[in-house]
Amino acid sequence: MREPEELMPDSGAVFTFGKSKFAENNPGKFWFKNDVPVHLSCGDEHSAVVTGNNKLYMFGSNNWGQLGLGSKSAISKPTCVKALKPEKVKLAACGRNHTLVSTEGGNVYATGGNNEGQLGLGDTEERNTFHVISFFTSEHKIKQLSAGSNTSAALTEDGRLFMWGDNSEGQIGLKNVSNVCVPQQVTIGKPVSWISCGYYHSAFVTTDGELYVFGEPENGKLGLPNQLLGNHRTPQLVSEIPEKVIQVACGGEHTVVLTENAVYTFGLGQFGQLGLGTFLFETSEPKVIENIRDQTISYISCGENHTALITDIGLMYTFGDGRHGKLGLGLENFTNHFIPTLCSNFLRFIVKLVACGGCHMVVFAAPHRGVAKEIEFDEINDTCLSVATFLPYSSLTSGNVLQRTLSARMRRRERERSPDSFSMRRTLPPIEGTLGLSACFLPNSVFPRCSERNLQESVLSEQDLMQPEEPDYLLDEMTKEAEIDNSSTVESLGETTDILNMTHIMSLNSNEKSLKLSPVQKQKKQQTIGELTQDTALTENDDSDEYEEMSEMKEGKACKQHVSQGIFMTQPATTIEAFSDEEVGNDTGQVGPQADTDGEGLQKEVYRHENNNGVDQLDAKEIEKESDGGHSQKESEAEEIDSEKETKLAEIAGMKDLREREKSTKKMSPFFGNLPDRGMNTESEENKDFVKKRESCKQDVIFDSERESVEKPDSYMEGASESQQGIADGFQQPEAIEFSSGEKEDDEVETDQNIRYGRKLIEQGNEKETKPIISKSMAKYDFKCDRLSEIPEEKEGAEDSKGNGIEEQEVEANEENVKVHGGRKEKTEILSDDLTDKAEDHEFSKTEELKLEDVDEEINAENVESKKKTVGDDESVPTGYHSKTEGAERTNDDSSAETIEKKEKANLEERAICEYNENPKGYMLDDADSSSLEILENSETTPSKDMKKTKKIFLFKRVPSINQKIVKNNNEPLPEIKSIGDQIILKSDNKDADQNHMSQNHQNIPPTNTERRSKSCTIL
């Protein structure tokens, strides 16, 4: 035997795959000098090779002495059993822990485990050297040996079958005995031509082509109807195979049958060992493997959970459990295969022998003439996977195949080869016509290596067929079903067109240079979204305590209104990630959190991750840049950043639907211009409303929902909206700073006048407080991030804070996104105005929001003015507010003095807005507050839907109401600004209060509002 330092001989080599001990989990090969293998056998963890010179080589595990080398130490190098040299070994069979050998002289030897008498030596003592079975003499010319878990079988040339060992399940065909220690003949009145022992069942073929099975009846591996399973301890004819059977192979829980024209499989196929695809994991009825009907199979072999087939031209197909690489499909493909997959590693070889074991496979193959040069598996592996995966399985479609067939390394390599085509291939739905398969193996890339024989031609034709296969074909079918269930698959986001089932949307950036992945939040109306945003701004000011109540009420409502909590949770996470992508530049890191639908911990972690990534710094910097650079520039830059990061996201899960949604999101951006494209652009018009809601919700979540949304995903919706609103309020102030840059985005927003005013106010505020505010907004973002990260720490609503924290993270991310995009900044400004408005009349904001929907533009104009004031105040407030936001709940009095001043300004504006809103709706500010308090109380008891609906209405309407309130806030005293946080909560509550009773709880709210106010003051 020679190691592979030298060129492989023309006679071929033995290749090992999986846990063979010769090369653990890696392909290995060896060959014999002046000798060739003629027989291979694999047990559970050991292997045997018989050469043409009648020598026996053993390697693998040896804990039972199954190698017959006189010890129990494992052998990693094929070792000749010298004791049998004189005997001229002819055949060998490896069971789970024992080995059988027959010699030309007619003797049969056994070694290894013997707990059930499977050695046939008349006792149950194990052996570590080969002992002759005295039962067999020269009269018994052995034709075939087979060994199972604790069973043994020998078939003579005259068709007599002898079996011994364990019979607890009838696996040796003896009806009334539990086990036998010496060979016993099994007769059915016909000579036997083929025998196979599985782990706990057996089968044989008669000379007239009939198949008989016996042994353990579970999982359909006997291929018998239920009425015949009662006699499973004796051989039963499988009548459902109409053709003449040639060979049979038994695995752990499945059986493979070779007939003259087809290959049948039955039993359990959870790993794909049946080769019947991903939709059939178990069958007691023999099924034909349709994918290889065009191939002439000459040999079959079964391992515990995998199967190998050899064609008449020397090609090999494998399928089943791919762990440890035992399918021989390459170093990078350890996934399960549910249909026969061509082993492209052997395209330049003629496969002659194969044996499958428990966790490995051994193959003997000889190279085509003129190709006997050294072969590196690494070179072959790259092509192997593609070729194997793109075999001409016409019956399979990309939808039927899972995308997990490719290993991580293979996916990386494919991305390196063609990242665009690879990512698109994995994420986009199949495209009619040819596919740009970066990883597929073109015949010219793989087959030119093949010899010029008919084999090459046949292989080429097969590959030609394979190429039309869509890349999805590579996916495991088993994974396929899971993917269908998960749909996010992380890799295929939103293949479904059902909005209710969508959690993320891919959208092109406004520049259409990059794709953006954002969570999909479903809402009925943009107005509702706007209202939600406003409510979120208000709730943001509210402490997490009231917000938690609101979030609790809203959780149920949110779940009802929004299709699922997971969607909302995922969306916030997505927004956060999008934010970090743009702000922090961590696209991939954020993407992972986005994929997570767990609204609670995930969002928090995601947002924290953004902070860790430097989101705060980036946000502050971007805020400065945006405030200094103008909204349009910032918007474009943010969009470019978003587009780049989104492009990565798109590569991860690129989708046309996402792009369309992004466009629609862009349409949304006029209203949410303050929000960056990250969260918004990727969403469809359908999702615009949802996105807006989410953004508003996210903003609210950042402040309030950190505490409460963590508790409940449903509360996440409302809590998210509330905290988002609060975030919008507190965050808007920094955004207002950004709004100087976001003014352009405000121009994009429908409320252009308001945006302009907001811009002016923001610009003024930015001029005055640009650096401090930027730092404040930085702090705000930082605090938000910290706060999100702190959500687990604060845990006012421990769990609620988790879910809401996630929402808050997303909200912050959305707000930061708003910063990135000037048009979206408008929304932030509106939210900041909402903070002031909410601070003064949370209730009015709600009631007025309904009216404001019609008065949005006018109110927006007023809003702009009030925003200018409010923004200025907010700008001063944001830093304090954000700083408080970090520790806002913990340190409410840190910046109370400054906050009070800022609040006074904001309160004036907010009161003006509130009054203005009150006038449209005919409600008093106090009524709004009381209603918000009432709503808070009710929200604890009322479903989340009501809360969310009110919030939604409030968000869009809130913007105009904010404008109105700003008008009145200028006229009204500052004190109600103190209740901004309370009013935020109240406002979100007021949504329900508007539905319930706007004025009942407002009187009760003031104390809480006072606390909120103090906190909001500190925040400001």
Curated annotation (Swiss-Prot):
GO terms for cellular component: centrosome; ciliary basal body; cytoplasm; Golgi apparatus; photoreceptor connecting cilium; photoreceptor outer segment; sperm flagellum. Residues 996-1009 have a biased composition (Polar residues). Residues 1018-1020 form a propeptide. It comes from the Eukaryota. The modification Phosphoserine is found at S418, S518. Changing G275S: In RP3; reduces interaction with PDE6D. The RCC1 repeat region mediates interactions with RPGRIP1. This is X-linked retinitis pigmentosa GTPase regulator. It comes from Homo sapiens (Human).
